A protein has these predicted regions:
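Phosphate-binding site of ATP-dependent enzymes
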Residues: 154-237, 258-265
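Conserved metal-phosphate-binding beta-hairpin within the catalytic cores
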Residues: 177, 188, 243-275, 285
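ATP-binding N-terminal substructure of ATP-dependent carboxylate-amine bond-forming enzymes
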Residues: 1-102, 109, 121-128
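Active-site nucleotide/adenylate-binding loops and adjacent lid/helix of ATP-dependent enzymes
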Residues: 1-14, 42, 52-53, 96-182
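Conserved small/polar residues in nucleotide/adenosyl-binding loops
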Residues: 284-290
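A short, polar/charged loop-to-alpha-helix boundary motif
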Residues: 207-208, 276-283
Length: 290
């Protein structure tokens, strides 16, 4: 790239201390390789191994830190304090996007469709939760990404074990009504939606979980996505509203479902999506704007 020097010295922030460290290392390596190949003066920077004060002297930061500490507004706040420009969503939008409950509250307040949910614990009246939300349920740690700690629950007697699994990763756990249908993901670049991708996990996994996202080679990514042109445009517009509602900007991803009646439901926002070879967004297939 002829004007790569305009970016100056770029820190590719990767790794970190979250449960998604290994994914971040893989994503960061892919981003670093693509930047260097494009002629950018880029270096890997792992906040687990180095003090963030060592970022002084870098001109920009490309954030590829997944999960807590990197996707929740913390590193964004440090970079703003150091006056270093960075990629993606700012402090507030990152903090909201990392919190599944706050994200859903904002979407609900904006009249955007998202599945009913409850915050739960082992002390909750689990029979009441099942009566209210029905079965199946999806149990999620509120502040984790990459499907870490998530479980699909089809029988009420399995709910306590799923909560215990989720609480290994987060003190706050939610139960969400399971949406049966087709899953889609919509990436954003420069704040605008890209073509919709249909996700088709293998038949032997319950949902698009951590293993399917990063360890399996038999997940199908459908482009075209199988929606009509009108439906795809409707989903893109819906996800753009959802992306903007939480204060996300730059690049990111929204995951959504279409139920058996054809209705769309918003699942989650990802302000720093995975960029590994297994991810629905691979940095090596993107080009830097000139």
């Amino acid at each position: 790239m002829s004007n790569a020097s305009k970016f100056g010295k770029v820190a590719v922030l990767l790794g970190g201390k979250s449960a998604e460290r290994e994914v971040s290392l893989d994503s960061g390596a892919a981003v670093l390789e693509a930047l260097v190949r494009s002629g950018v003066n880029a270096e890997a920077f792992d906040p687990k191994e180095r003090s963030v004060t060592e970022l002084v002297g870098y001109d920009r930061a490309f954030i590829v830190l997944h999960g807590r500490g990197g996707e929740d507004g913390q590193i964004q706040g440090v970079l703003e304090w150091l006056n270093i420009p960075y990629t993606g969503t700012g402090v507030q939008g990152s903090a909201i996007g990392m919190d599944k409950v706050k994200t859903k509250q904002i979407w609900q307040g904006s009249d955007l469709p998202t599945a009913p949910y409850r915050i739960i614990s082992q002390e909750s009246d689990l029979a009441e939760v099942v009566a209210n939300l029905g079965l199946p349920l999806i149990i999620k740690p509120v502040h984790e990404g990459s499907s870490v700690g998530m479980s699909k629950v089809e029988k009420a007697e399995d709910l306590a074990a799923a909560i215990a699994k989720a609480t290994q990763h987060d003190a706050v756990v939610m139960a969400e009504k399971w949406i049966t249908g087709r899953e889609f993901t919509i990436s954003f670049l420069n704040g605008q939606p890209l073509p919709v991708i249909r996700l088709q996990p293998p038949a032997d996994v319950a949902f698009y979980d951590y293993e399917a996202k990063y360890q399996r080679n038999d997940v199908e990514y459908g482009i075209p996505c199988g929606l009509s042109t009108e439906e795809e445009q409707k989903l893109q517009a819906l996800c753009l509203r959802a992306f903007q509602a939480v204060g996300a900007s730059g690049w990111g991803r929204i995951d959504a479902m279409q139920d058996e009646q054809g209705n769309f439901w918003l699942l989650e926002v990802n302000t720093v999506p995975g960029m590994t070879s297994h991810s629905s967004v691979s940095y090596t297939h993107l080009t830097l704007p000139t």
